[in-house]
Amino acid sequence: MKKIVFTGGGTVGHVTLNLLLIPKFIKEGWQVHYVGDKHGIEYQEIQKSGLDVTFHSVATGKLRRYFSWQNLLDGFKVVWGIFQSLGIMLKVRPQALFSKGGFVSVPPVIAARLSGVPVYVHESDLSIGLANKIAYKCATKMYATFEQPSSLNKIEHVGAVTKVGSQESVLPQELEEIRQYFDKELPTLLFVGGSAGAKVFNDFVSQNQAALTERYNVINLTGDASLDVLSERLFRRAYVTDLYQPLMDLADVVVTRGGSNTIFELLAMAKLHIIVPLGREASRGDQIENADYFVKKGYAKQLAEEQLDMSHLQAALDDLLANQASYHQAMKNSQEIKSVDEFYALLKADIDKGKK
């Protein structure tokens, strides 16, 4: 039986593509394994998916670009994780390893290289993260959402891989109930922050609820069940599954962080959006670079986190809505989207070519 190992985690963004690809491999008879941290979000997402995947937990350590005594302890964890991953590779003997990045992916990627397993890596951001810089050295091939320097000759620019916008969504009954609380004459805003950046949006909506709902219907995907509410012109929910795409369709404008997965989903839908990227104090600055790229391309507006107030938000919304035709046209003209099926076919072809 053909076998493949997936890895990637730390945030939902480092798991999403894996969850889209795994069912396709299973359908074609592959045995699928996943290497990550049993305490990490990757384990939660795999368990929640119900997919027939064997999960292997290994020691992982956070990768830092600055000096910290914690680096010594985490260095030992990474080394131990490599030995654990080597044992997994030698036992499973997969045809390939696919990594979506994140610090949890470093031990299995290195182990795969050491054991002669072809390594395929995906990088979503404009600047390559530290984990994927290490992975590049071990990679048979790396796929990139953004164009990268030609000197990195193992990288193929594939654009964003997304399933959103490729098919009609089925409307859950709950959507009609939500609509009954909304004013049809007002535009609808959707705030979505992702696993690492929702709190700022949650606080903003809580502090400005009256001002927001006076002018807009507001949807807030919070990640915090204590904030769940459905009231006049306001719907707040911790997590949504079947409702996600219908709510996106309902929204006139989405206010989002700058994670690559989400903003390219919005591009695929040609959905008006404002990007409020995580700042450099909370990240390596990749979301700022992603947002700058989208603004330069004419896809979106951008607000710095410290600019997130009613005055700046209203100015950005006024511009988006007044010039929506040009934003929509720029997004519709984009050639930066690849379907999951297209990417799966590419990956499979490369794995077949890479077999020894």
Curated annotation (Swiss-Prot):
Q: Where does it sit, as one GO cellular component term?
A: plasma membrane
Q: Report the principal subcellular site.
A: membrane
Q: In which pathway does it act?
A: Cell wall biogenesis; peptidoglycan biosynthesis
The record's EC number reads 2.4.1.227
Q: Name one Pfam family in it.
A: Glyco_tran_28_C
Q: Where in the cell is it found?
A: Cell membrane
Q: Which GO terms describe its molecular function?
A: undecaprenyldiphospho-muramoylpentapeptide beta-N-acetylglucosaminyltransferase activity
What this protein catalyses is: Mur2Ac(oyl-L-Ala-gamma-D-Glu-L-Lys-D-Ala-D-Ala)-di-trans,octa-cis-undecaprenyl diphosphate + UDP-N-acetyl-alpha-D-glucosamine = beta-D-GlcNAc-(1->4)-Mur2Ac(oyl-L-Ala-gamma-D-Glu-L-Lys-D-Ala-D-Ala)-di-trans,octa-cis-undecaprenyl diphosphate + UDP + H(+)
Q: Where does UDP-N-acetyl-alpha-D-glucosamine bind?
A: S195, Q287
Keyword Glycosyltransferase tagged = yes
Membrane topology annotation: Peripheral membrane protein
Tell me the keywords, alphabetical order: Cell cycle, Cell division, Cell membrane, Cell shape, Cell wall biogenesis/degradation, Glycosyltransferase, Membrane, Peptidoglycan synthesis, Transferase
Q: What class of enzyme is it?
A: transferase
Q: Which GO terms describe its biological process?
A: carbohydrate metabolic process; cell division; cell wall organization; lipid glycosylation; peptidoglycan biosynthetic process; regulation of cell shape
Superkingdom as given in the UniProt entry: Bacteria
This molecule's function is given as: Cell wall formation. Catalyzes the transfer of a GlcNAc subunit on undecaprenyl-pyrophosphoryl-MurNAc-pentapeptide (lipid intermediate I) to form undecaprenyl-pyrophosphoryl-MurNAc-(pentapeptide)GlcNAc (lipid intermediate II).
Family, per entry? Belongs to the glycosyltransferase 28 family. MurG subfamily.
This one is known as UDP-N-acetylglucosamine--N-acetylmuramyl-(pentapeptide) pyrophosphoryl-undecaprenol N-acetylglucosamine transferase
